[in-house]
A protein has these predicted regions:
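Aromatic (phenylalanine/tyrosine) cluster motif
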Residues: 2, 8-12, 23, 41
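Asp-based, Mg2+/Mn2+-dependent phosphohydrolase catalytic module
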Residues: 10, 41-45, 137-140, 154-259
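Residue-level detector of anion-binding/catalytic polar loops
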Residues: 76, 145, 222
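Conserved phosphate-coupling serine/threonine residues in phosphotransfer and NTP-handling enzymes
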Residues: 150-152
Length: 259
């Protein structure tokens, strides 16, 4: 427990799942293992948010940035690139680019061109995901510390938060620039948890992407998936703790302590 902080408990009842949410095998096993009988309890004292596709409707925007970024370098867009690159940053992202354009391509120049296109688009407020305001306000009222852990650059994270006046909710901002291994490696979530002063087993990670869920699960976090562009597949259902259709459902689940 931390002075000045609140804690909430998540429980799992295998006979009564939360409306609109579902449990993955890993989540159900973890919760049952910590509870009594058919119910398990998890003490959550910190929440870590992904940004693109979870807080803001920006994954669709990123998908449109690749074509002009590549065209500026005289290169064609190759099908599947944006999906493979989703949720990655740094050398991981450059390696994805090399997979599509060859090991000898100038991956750094391609990524720089991508960020140049994104910088222009992100000067104005980007669309928020439904339920974000309500979830942040409730967590703030409960004195639950929050972090953003995003593969995006720090200036992009700060700009998106500042454009909506919500940076004050977060005591920690973790950027892909601060880690050497991007998602699906859990390094960025571990960094955020360390700065929040919470352990992975007591930190809730909210993610929309496959790589993000992989990272949360690999790091031992309580990982809730809120799918954006891609629905949860069999792998995700094995990895995540639970799935919700929106941030409103995340909030409902926390209030009801159903998961």
């Amino acid at each position: 427990m931390f002075p000045g902080r609140s804690t909430f408990f998540i429980f799992y009842d295998q006979n009564r799942p939360a409306n609109g949410s579902s449990f993955g095998r890993a989540g159900a096993k973890r919760l049952r293992g910590q509870g009594r009988g058919q119910k398990g309890y998890l003490m959550i004292n910190g929440v870590i948010f992904d940004m693109d596709g979870l807080m803001f409707d920006t994954e669709r925007m990123w998908a449109t940035f690749w074509e002009p970024a590549l065209a500026a370098l005289g290169l064609p867009y190759k099908k599947g690139l944006s999906e493979a690159a989703r949720g990655t940053a740094g050398e991981t992202l450059r390696n994805v680019v090399r997979q599509f354009y060859g090991q000898d391509c100038n991956a750094a120049a391609i990524v720089d061109s991508l960020h140049a296109v994104a910088d222009k688009a992100f000067q104005k407020p980007v669309p928020k995901k439904p339920g974000l305001d309500e979830l942040l306000a409730w967590l703030d009222e409960q004195h639950i510390p929050m972090a953003v852990a995003s593969s995006s650059r720090m200036d992009v994270i700060q700009r998106n938060l500042d454009n909506w006046g919500m940076r004050h909710y977060f005591s920690v901002l973790a950027s892909g620039q601060q880690v050497t291994r991007s998602k699906p490696d859990p390094e960025i979530f571990r960094l955020a948890a360390e700065k929040l002063g919470v352990t992975p087993g007591h930190a809730l990670v909210l993610e929309d992407s496959y790589n993000g869920v992989r990272a949360g699960a690999a790091g031992g976090f309580v990982t809730v998936m809120v799918p954006d562009l891609l629905p949860a597949d069999a792998e995700m259902r094995r990895l995540y703790t639970a799935e919700c259709r929106s941030l409103f459902e995340v909030l409902d689940g926390l209030k009801a302590k159903r998961w």
